Amino acid sequence: HHNTDAFGDTAPQDICISSTYWMMGPAWLCTHFWTHYEYTGDREFLKKIFPVMLEAALFYLDFLVEKDGVLVMCPSVSPENTYRLPNGQQGAVSYGVTMDNQILRDLFSQCIKAGEILEGTDFSAHLKEMEVMENCGEFIDKIVDACGKLSPTQIGSDGRIKEWMEEYEECEPGHRHISHLYGLYPSRQISVDKTPELAEAAKKTLETRLRLGGGHTGWSRAWIINFYARLHDGESAYHNIELMLEQSTYSNLFDRHPPFQIDGNFGVVSGIAEMLLQSDEESVRLLPALPGAWKNGSVKGLRIAGGGSVSMEWKDGHLDRCVIEAGNPMKRVIRYGDTADEIMLASGKTEWNPVLC
């Protein structure tokens, strides 16, 4: 729930239906557990938090219902946003909202991966506490089945990512929330390399939202920087950094919502890192969204998925030197511009030069 507190208060908090009935907080928080494991490879940590992930999955498995051959959350809302019905009435509650599907796809797929990594570990006591009758493998099979039945991210007739299952008219077309692009960032479900059609639709979604007044809060502007970084659009990402500093930053450098919200500060730092380096379990992309304003520069110790870090130097807008320090041996495709070089990274430092590919 969006407002669960230390005292166990999980009741709807107020009359703002479009936020009060958002129930994806636990699933999103669980993805942070996985991200920590993904970047550290800490198996003991994964073993410790896996039961939490399973319990979150259990809740959503119980909550999902079938609609037109797919599993959907119902009731469901797109956080703080509303739509207009054909009769002119304003609505918020729906079913199978895009953000819900994307978050659940992350949670379920991460539970599946964690189950594979921890295969053979006994979680029977935890499952018994959860009142799950199956063994861990059988329960994971249920998650696999449900994950395959989630509605995919859809493109509307106007070429944008659909926010709701239905193509509703938006009450506020320039809304600060762009929740249906969760799949672009922080998730990796939408990418320029693997899902170009969805990436193009995400770009159009973003451009339309901004043209109509979006990005007017600091945290929203920070999210937009990350979106453009994932779209490999360094100039747009940099432009939004400028807007962030000009319009959404106090003199003490606190993010301006208004008032102060620290997620804007964290988000812009994340966006800058994403402009310089992006990675997943298969590849490492160097300088994916380098703007012209950063003609020369260097960065040290940016973390990569799988455990390790990257340090780089660039001159005149081109990569000059790259050192990858892997925490353990792993195969990765190193991407820079149009270059894609599959290499086996040994533990320790590896110097990579695109000229030698």
Q: For the regions a protein language model found, what residue spans apply to each?
A:
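Non-catalytic C-terminal accessory modules of carbohydrate-active enzymes
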Residues: 235-356
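Primarily short, surface-exposed interaction patches in extracytoplasmic proteins
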Residues: 35-57, 62, 66, 73-79, ...
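Aromatic- and acidic-residue-enriched carbohydrate-binding clefts of CAZyme catalytic domains
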Residues: 2-15, 81-93
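Structural beta-strand/beta-sheet cores of well-ordered domains, especially the beta-sheet scaffolds
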Residues: 25, 57, 69, 97, ...
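Active-site core of glycosidic bond-cleaving carbohydrate-active enzymes
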Residues: 4-39, 43, 47, 98-283, ...
